[in-house]
A protein has these predicted regions:
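Helix-loop-strand module that forms the ligand-binding subsite of alpha/beta enzymes
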Residues: 3-75
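Glycine-rich phosphate/pyrophosphate-binding loop and the adjoining helix
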Residues: 66-118
Length: 118
């Protein structure tokens, strides 16, 4: 069986109208399975089952600033991953690309360099 074999998860998503694309929302709905990605404890609280995983999020946007009050994708996606038990989440952002494409790309490249430097 191939259940939960990946230790690293990479999700790339644009901010569409301030939130997640419909396909990413559909993925989260399909992935949320009792006994697979989370469970309920006897006290009724939930527990994520995907422990010791590392998620990398590559978030892009045309005009929305990442982590601004208009960004509903990033906090939602971090919540969903935590709901599944994935607590280690690193974000690479290329936001506001419509405003200054070159700057956005350079900043994203710098974030990648910083994440993966030896």
């Amino acid at each position: 069986m191939y259940k939960r074999q990946s230790d690293i998860i990479i999700i790339s998503a644009p901010i569409y109208n301030y939130g997640p694309p419909a396909t990413l929302k559909a993925w989260s709905d399909l992935a949320a399975r009792i006994g697979e990605t989370f469970r309920f404890k006897p006290n009724g609280r939930r527990e994520g089952l995907l422990k010791n995983k590392h998620a990398y999020l590559v978030i892009t946007s045309g005009g929305t600033k990442l982590n601004s009050s208009e960004d509903f994708l990033t906090p939602w996606l971090k919540f969903i991953l935590n709901f599944f038990g994935i607590e280690k989440v690193d974000i690479i952002s290329a936001d506001q690309m419509a405003l200054d494409y070159e700057k956005s790309i350079k900043e994203a490249e710098a974030q990648i360099e910083n994440l993966f430097k030896d």
